[in-house]
Amino acid sequence: MSVVPVVDVLQGRAAVDSEVTVRGWVRTRRDSKAGISFLAVYDGSCFDPLQAVVNNSLPNYQDEVLHLTTGCSIEVTGVVVASPGEGQSFELQATAIKVVGWVDDPDTYPMAAKRHSIEYLREVAHLRPRTNLIGAVARVRHTLAQAIHRFYHENGFFWVSTPLITASDTEGAGEMFRVSTLDLENLPRTDKGAVDFSQDFFGKEAFLTVSGQLNGETYACALSKIYTFGPTFRAENSNTSRHLAEFWMIEPEVAFADLEDIAELAEKMLKYVFQAVLNERMDDMQFFAERVDKDAIDRLQRFVTSDFAQVDYTEAVEILIASGQTFENPVSWGIDLSSEHERYLAEKHFKAPVVVKNYPKDIKAFYMRMNDDGKTVAAMDVLAPGIGEIIGGAQREERLDVLDQRLEAMGLNKEDYWWYRDLRRYGTVPHAGFGLGFERLIAYVTGVQNVRDVIPFPRTPRNATF
C-alpha cells in the first residue's frame, strides 16, 4: 500500500491506474441516485481536496460511508483515474474506505460546511486551520519562512538564535512583559520598599524580548552576516489589526555595511520571497485573489518587477505638505509618519515601494547612527503600496562616545548596556540591519486584513485562550 499526499494525486505524481492510499478529512459528501457517493477529501498538502468516488458495492457503504460528515477522518484506498468531471484532473476510484475518526455530533460541529465569519473563527482557533482560509494562510506562512531561510543561506548569512528572556530594552520604550518567579503574594522588598529583584530567578529584572537586534549585533561583529528569525513580545495595549503581543521577526545584521547596503538587501529579500510564493503557492494565491483580495496576485507581481524609490524623510515631509491632501494626522518636520502618510507616498506619489531614510533623531532609537547634521539618524523604513511600513532598519552607531551621548539623552543607564558598548571598544565596525514583522509580511501577501488571522494562536490584550 502506497500512502501519498493529496497534492501528489492532483498534480499527477501518482501514476494513473496505480493503487494508492490517502489519509485526510471529509470536506463534503455528495450522494447520487445511482448508488455512488462523492467524497471531497483534504489533507492540507494543497488547497484543493481530492474527489474519491465510492460505489455502493463497498461492504461498509450503507453503515459507514453514507454517515460520513464534514470533519470525519478517513483512509481511502483506490485507483488513480483521469477525472471526467470539471475541477480536477485526477480522482480516486475507491476500493476501500476506513473511518478513522467520527465527528461526535455533526449538528454542533463548529466547522460545519458553510462560510464562517473571521471573528467566529478566532473563537475556535484550535479548529480554524481546517477552513480553506486558514489552511491557505498556513501554507503561505510556511513557504515565506522557508524562502526567508533559503535567501539568507544562499547569500552567506548565518542564522543566530537570540534569547527570548532579556534584561535589555532594545527599543527603550518600556513596553515589555516581565519574567519573574517571585511570589506575588509575598514580594521581597528592599530597604526603600521597592521590589527586590536580586532575589528573583535571574538575580535582576528580566523581560521577554522585544527584539533580537542587540544580541544579533554581537554575532554580526564576528560572523559578518547574520539574521535572527523568532518570536518577539510587546506589552502594548493595542487592539488594532496591525498589532500582536507575540509576533515573529526577521532581523538581519551586516558588518561593514551602511544604510544603502541594507536598503538594497531589503529589496532583494522581499522580491525573492514574494517570487517564491508566486512559484510555489499559486493555488492558495488564487483563492486569496478570488475570496479575500482580488489584487493579491497582481500586487506581488507588480512588487517583484518594481524598482524601489528612495527619498529622504525631509523631502517626504515636503511632498506630503505639498500634496494638498487633508490628513488625519497633520504633517510637519519631526513627526513620526503615520500609516496614512506612508500609504500616500507609496500608493499615490511614487506608485511603487519606497525607502524613506534619514529620520529625525528624536523619534528614533538610541542605537541608530547620528548623521553629520546632528539632527537626523541613518534610519530607514520600507513602505509598500497597500500597507505602508513593512520594514524598519538603520545603520548602527559604532562610535562609543556618540552612543553614550545618545543613551544619556534618552535617560538610559549606559551601565545596563555595558556588553553592547564593548562592541564599540573592541574592533568596532560600521554595521547595519533591519527588522521585518513576519505577520505583517504574511498579511501583505495574502490580503488578509488582520494580523490575528495569519498567526496560529494570536496573543492580544485580554486574549491568551489557546
UniProtKB/Swiss-Prot annotation:
The entry's keywords: Aminoacyl-tRNA synthetase, ATP-binding, Cytoplasm, Ligase, Nucleotide-binding, Protein biosynthesis
Enzyme Commission number(s): 6.1.1.22
Pfam family, any one: tRNA_anti-codon
Gene3D superfamilies per the UniProt record, alphabetical: Bira Bifunctional Protein, Domain 2, Nucleic acid-binding proteins
InterPro entries, per database record: Aa-tRNA-synt_II, aa-tRNA-synth_II, aa-tRNA-synth_II/BPL/LPL, Asn-tRNA-ligase, Asp/Asn-tRNA-synth_IIb, NA-bd_OB-fold, NA-bd_OB_tRNA
Organism whose genome encodes this protein: Serratia proteamaculans (strain 568)
Cellular localization per UniProt: Cytoplasm
Family: Belongs to the class-II aminoacyl-tRNA synthetase family.
GO CC term (a single one): cytoplasm
Matching NCBIfam families: asnS, PRK03932.1
Oligomer and partners: Homodimer.
The protein's name: Asparagine--tRNA ligase
GO molecular function term, any single one: ATP binding
Domain of life assignment: Bacteria
A GO biological-process term: asparaginyl-tRNA aminoacylation
UniProt catalytic activity: tRNA(Asn) + L-asparagine + ATP = L-asparaginyl-tRNA(Asn) + AMP + diphosphate + H(+)
